[in-house]
Every structure is written in C-alpha cells, then in structure tokens.
C-alpha cells in the first residue's frame, strides 16, 4: 500500500436507475374504488398528477394516449451480443424472455431491467417463443425446424425433432390450449396435439415460405401469410383452406388477430403496406397505410384493442390508433430513432404498461407510458438521433437533471441568462435556478449564518 494514500477512501459516485413499479397505480385504483370515486379518463398537465396515473385497463376506451409506450426507459444487452429474433413476456409480466441467434434464452427483470439468468435452449437460432393462454407452458421453435415444450421454470419436457424441414417462423395456441399450430419455410402449416406432441394435420396450399400464422382467440380459425403474397384462412377441424385473400405485392411478414375479441386482423407486408381487415364483414378493409420503409414486425396492444405497433426496417417504431378520426391513416406516434438497425421483435407486457423491442443492433429496449409533464420527453437520442458512445447511460441519470433543449424538445426556450452560459466547446450547460432567500416572505435579509 502506498503510504501517501494510507487512510484515504475512494470516493464513490451514485447515479439514478430507472425502475417501473406498476403497484402504485393499482394502489391508486384500489383507493378510488374503495371510496366510490370515478376513474378520470385523462391526466392533468401537472407533474403532481403523475401519482394519479392508473393501470392501463382502468382507462377503457379513452386511454389510448395515456397507454401509448413512448418514453425510452432502459437499454439492455447480453455480454456476448447476438441478434435477437424473438421476445416474449412471462404470463405474470414480471420478466422478459429474450431469444438469440445462438440458441440461448435470457431473462430480464420487467421492473428494474436487471439481467437474471441465461441458458442454452436450442442448438440453432431460436426464432419464435409462445406461451399458452393459461401461462402453464411455452413452446419454442428454432431455425433447424425443431420444437420444444417448456414449463414456466424453463424445465424442458418434450422435444419434437424435425417438426419442420426448414426454419420455424410462428407458433400459435388454440383458444383451449389443447392444440397449437406452427408454420415454417417448408411451405406448410402443421397442427399439433399438445397433450402428446403428435402431429394431427398438415395445412398445404401455400406455394412458398409461410412467414406467419395465428389462431383466432375465440374461434376455430387460422390465418397464415406467405412469401407467395397470399393470406389464407384455414379450418383447423378439416385442415382445408376456406378463403384466400389477395391485395399485397410482396411477402406477407405478419398476420395477427386482435388478442381478445379477434374481430380485426392486421397484416404487414414487404411491399411497405399495413392493412387492417374486419373478418365479420367478409374481411372488409378498414385501414391501409403505405410507408417509405419496410414494416418488419407487428404487435397489438393487449389492453387497447384499437392500438397496434409496428417496427420498421430503419429502426423506427410507430403506433397506430384505429379510433383516430382526424388522420386515420397516419401513425399517432412515431419514435424515429428507436433502434440503430432493423427492428426484429416487439412484445407488450400483459398489463400493457411496458413495451420491449429488439433489433439487429443486438439490444433490447424498454418503453413505458409517458408522464404528465416531461420536459425531456422528446429530447432523448431516440427522437433527435444525437447519439454518442454510451448515450443511454446519460439519459436522466440524475433525478434532478436539467438538460438543454433542442428543436426537438417541447420545453420552453432557454432564457437569456442560459444563453450566456456557454462552455468552451460551444455547448451550453443549463443549471437549475435557485430561488433567492430574499424572495421568501419575512426573510428580507436572509437567514443568519447561511450564505447562498
């Protein structure tokens, strides 16, 4: 030990870490119910009203703006980084399961976003993971056509080798969880008996890779999308195709029913279009939008069933609201620089207060509902693209941080005093103003013994 440093202690620096606690919202809801008060469908534009934010399901039809996940909260990544093709939340919403191209499962906390565990799940890339409706089982598929069934504690109970000849693209459970359907690049869909793991039917009809499939949440109806630009509806009892839809000029990327009612079907394609159909009216087209970039992944909001989110090839994330009347074919919210590369997967927490996104930039990013008044809401690098090394560690690490606004921000323009507070490198540092003691009533000369 150096005698010159003997007796000295190393100074430790602390930083704030964002944590999401949904229990406070449920406590507030319980208080309102107990005292017979009505839920407010809006939040006052005042920071003190942040404590009044309720759970997403408490707002009903009027909570679209409140429940939209627009605020970047945390960035997570494994030590050994790989592309992340699939995400899913555990049924209770406490953890996020992340699948990687090297066949691993990793678990992340859904509140503090800490890393919890990692395991080797498949010998090749894990391409899809799906929980049953009851949450008692999970099925995963890999790039070598293998399917595996897991318990909630990630104890593997069954392996189905060569379930498909090519990469498994999608898995979806029936409403009763007694069966599930899988699709693959081998041009077919297969229906499996969950209790014994045996194949029941093969749904043939597509002429190219089947990229997506989904089982209706209430009915015996399966939808699939393929590289042959076709959307097909199937009867799982007979295994026959009941209808074929045209209308796209390129590969169908994703087809998803509404998670609860199932009345609407959303479809995205590589022809840069997104469409929503009403299956109650012979698949009438209700919504259509065309973009300048490819849509890569799609996810419905679990609570607000008129809201869905798409991830794009350029790394942006866009929220759409079908109940919007002013501009029905425009996104209600756009996060232009959500990721540095193509977005590969989106997953909402079952409660609906957090959204996780994955990308080919090998990171997982968590997004939460915005607050009533947030001066830095649209001044994050995910909105203005002012990213430097480790930019995500510097976002609001100090709970009292006040950062200079850009033209992308929504705060008031800086005052004249802050304009004169420039650093040598041309940047400006803004410090919060402290009220003078002389402004307090009865304290004209300040407090004795204290200097400000």
UniProtKB/Swiss-Prot annotation:
WD repeat residue numbers: 79-118, 121-160, 163-202, 205-244, 247-287, 290-330, 338-377
Subcellular location: Nucleus
SMART domains xref list: WD40
Biased composition (Polar residues): 416-426
GO terms for cellular component: mRNA cleavage and polyadenylation specificity factor complex
Repeat recorded as keyword: yes
Keyword Nucleus: yes
Gene3D superfamilies per UniProt: YVTN repeat-like/Quinoprotein amine dehydrogenase (2.130.10.10)
Entry-linked InterPro entries: G-protein_beta_WD-40_rep, Pfs2-like, WD40/YVTN_repeat-like_dom_sf, WD40_repeat_dom_sf, WD40_rpt
GO terms (BP aspect): chromosome segregation; mRNA 3'-end processing
Main subcellular location of this protein, as a coarse class: nucleus
Top-level taxon in the UniProt lineage: Eukaryota
Location of region: Disordered: 409-452
Composition bias, Gly residues: 443-452
Keywords: Chromosome partition, mRNA processing, Nucleus, Repeat, WD repeat
Biological function: Required for 3'-end cleavage and polyadenylation of pre-mRNAs. Also involved in chromosome segregation where it has a role in chromosome attachment to the mitotic spindle.
PANTHER family: PRE-MRNA 3' END PROCESSING PROTEIN WDR33, WD40 REPEAT PROTEIN
UniProt name for this protein: Polyadenylation factor subunit 2
Species this chain originates from: Kluyveromyces lactis (strain ATCC 8585 / CBS 2359 / DSM 70799 / NBRC 1267 / NRRL Y-1140 / WM37)
Gene: PFS2
